[in-house]
Design a protein with these regions (language model features):
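N-terminal catalytic or cofactor-binding beta/alpha core of small enzyme domains
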Residues: 1-102, 107-183
Length: 183
C-alpha cells in the first residue's frame, strides 16, 4: 500500500446497522497486511482534543485502545490529550517516539461525500493541516477519519460536528485496531 493509495473505509450509520462487521473485517485485513509488510506499530499517537467535538476522534480512540491493549504505548487520550498546543512538548518528553514504528490517528475535514470515511495510509500524518496549522509530520502509518466538511471556518465546523458520528468512528477504529493487533 503506497502513500498515494489509501485504503478508504466508507462509514455510515447504515453500514453499522447492516454491514458493520464485514466493514470492520475489511479494515482488520488491511491493517494486518500493513503490519506484515511494514511491521507492527510499537506506539500509537492519537491527536486531538476533547474540547472540540470533531477533534475528539483521536483521544477517544486512544482512551479505548489504552484499555484494550495495555501493552501498546498510547499517547493521546481523553485524560491526557495530544494536540497542536502541546505536541512539541510531547515529542520533547518522548524523544524516542519518532524512532518507533508509530501509528498516528487524527480527525480530518474533507469533502461532503467523504464525511464518515476512514483512510488507512502508509506514511506520516500531517496533523493540523485541516485547520491550516504547520505541525511536524508524524508516524510510519496513519488513520484519519473525515468527521465533517472542510474549506471554510474550520474551527467552527469542528466545534459543531456530530458527537454520535465521532464516537461511532472512534469505536470502529478501536475495534479494527484491537483485532488487528491481537494475535
Amino acid at each position: 500500500m503506497a502513500d498515494t493509495e489509501p485504503m478508504k473505509v466508507p462509514f455510515s450509520d447504515h453500514r453499522i446497522a447492516t454491514k458493520g462487521q464485514s466493514t470492520v473485517d475489511e479494515a482488520v485485513r488491511t491493517l494486518r497486511s500493513l503490519w506484515r509488510q511494514h511491521g507492527v506499530p510499537e506506539a500509537l499517537l492519537c491527536i486531538g482534543t476533547d474540547r472540540s467535538t470533531g477533534d475528539a476522534l483521536g483521544p477517544l480512540v486512544g482512551t479505548e485502545i489504552e484499555t484494550q491493549l495495555p501493552r501498546l504505548k498510547v499517547l493521546g487520550t481523553l485524560n491526557h490529550p495530544v494536540h497542536a498546543g502541546n505536541l512539541e512538548d510531547v515529542l520533547r518528553n518522548y524523544p524516542d517516539l519518532t524512532q518507533k514504528r508509530l501509528l498516528a490517528v487524527d480527525a480530518s475535514l474533507g469533502r461532503l461525500q467523504d464525511v464518515g470515511t476512514l483512510l488507512i495510509r502508509l506514511g506520516p500524518l500531517r496533523p493540523g493541516s485541516g485547520v491550516n496549522k504547520q505541525l511536524p509530520p508524524l508516524g510510519h502509518y496513519h488513520i484519519t477519519g473525515t468527521v465533517n466538511v472542510g474549506g471554510f471556518m474550520e474551527y467552527f465546523v469542528l466545534q459543531n460536528t456530530r458527537l454520535a458520528l465521532v464516537m461511532q468512528m472512534a469505536s470502529f477504529i478501536s475495534l479494527a485496531l484491537a483485532a488487528s493487533l491481537n494475535p
